[in-house]
């Protein structure tokens, strides 16, 4: 049986080797037939501490690693560039 894979955005990376990933899905309201967004947060294992807040990542289901961690980061699909740009502009202003 294949493992579930989800795509989401890293919300927090303040823990060691753990990131919080928010996965958003769209579903149709049963009565009003309007599409609404629902999101859920997953704790995922990030072995190399390479994920930053805002990155889009692919996570995969795995065995329980701790009380709340049941997922692991497979790959970083898209890096968040804005955080790095603001850091570089602050450094150039100081110099």
UniProtKB/Swiss-Prot annotation:
Outline what the protein does: One of the primary rRNA binding proteins, it binds specifically to the 5'-end of 16S ribosomal RNA.
Q: Which GO terms describe its molecular function?
A: rRNA binding; structural constituent of ribosome
**What InterPro entries does the database record attribute to this sequence?**
NA-bd_OB-fold, Ribosomal_uS17, Ribosomal_uS17_bact/chlr, Ribosomal_uS17_CS
- Report the gene name: rpsQ
- Which GO CC annotations does the UniProt entry carry? cytosolic small ribosomal subunit
The family note in this entry says: Belongs to the universal ribosomal protein uS17 family.
Query: Which keywords describe this protein according to UniProt?
Result: Ribonucleoprotein, Ribosomal protein, RNA-binding, rRNA-binding
Query: What organism does the UniProt record list as the source?
Result: Pseudothermotoga lettingae (strain ATCC BAA-301 / DSM 14385 / NBRC 107922 / TMO)
Quaternary structure (record) = Part of the 30S ribosomal subunit.
**Tell me, what is an example of a GO biological process annotation in this record?**
translation
Name recorded for this polypeptide: Small ribosomal subunit protein uS17
For this protein, the record's SUPFAM superfamilies field holds: Nucleic acid-binding proteins
Could you tell me the superkingdom of the organism this chain comes from? Answer: Bacteria
Does the record carry Ribonucleoprotein as a key word? Answer: yes
Q: Which NCBIfam families has this protein been placed in?
A: PRK05610.1 (NF004123), uS17_bact (TIGR03635)
